Amino acid sequence: MPWPKLEEVQRDAMIEESVEESIKDYGNTVLYSTARNEYMIVRIKQLIRRSVWALTRQMEKGDFEPSGYEMNFGSGKIDRVDTCEDEDVVYVKVTDYKTGMKSFDIVALYHGLQMQLPVYLNAALELEERRASGKTVEPAGIFYYRIKDPIVDREKDDHALEEKILKELRLDGMINAKEEVIEHLEHQLSGTSVLNPIGKNKDGSLNRYSKVLPPEAFAAMLSYTKKKEAQVKRQIYAGEVQANPYELNGSTGCDYCAYRDICGFDPRLDGYSYRSLEKYSKEEVIRRMEEEIENREEPS
């Protein structure tokens, strides 16, 4: 039985069993050696319960079902692939679990950063095409789920409290704006969703907060990702490993770099500066992607 269809007591029992098995792998004496470690185990279980609860709510509202977990491709691993069959079409989306606050940025993708999610979706689409038995396979979306147990203010009733928690755990990413995809993703959507990065206006159109791309633009994003991925591979094979960190929206390639203490790059010294990347609107990024694909140019 798919986990979204399990009763809460069943899910809790499986979480308890899974965590205890993991503890045994590390050695009971280590993780239960101090009161602090024991408390950490309790917090881990709480965090997993909250995540499973939120992920279940997200799945319950739509027609997608998990088709694979921790799926390997090359040296990568996709946390979760979901599919939805609609007559002769199979829609595919991927979800990656994160402990930080990362949000998907299509401008960063254009510059060769944040390629993980679209690379994963391209791989998942190829896999599902081999399974589809002649059916058309189409992309539905790419998502980050942030693993956390948010603290929110109390509400007057349980439903309002649940909505507030779900809003804090809402998925981030990019969605194919095709009408069928939106309907399969979340039934009877009205207003701004607390589950997915989408919302509808009173006239039924998607609101300005929706993180969506028209089907043609979504396809262009995936095609561009393939070209950019090939370019990055060629650069690595050619030995292009110079310290040339970027700067975009106040973030730099050095912020979380494990080698920053030994690479020698220091922007405080003469001759060292970050590679400043251009900022574009979503529409401008898609236009540039489509032009580079059409002109068969090397991605910039």
Question: What are the roles of these predicted feature ranges?
Answer:
Residues 1-300:
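Structural signature of nuclease core domains in nucleic-acid processing machines
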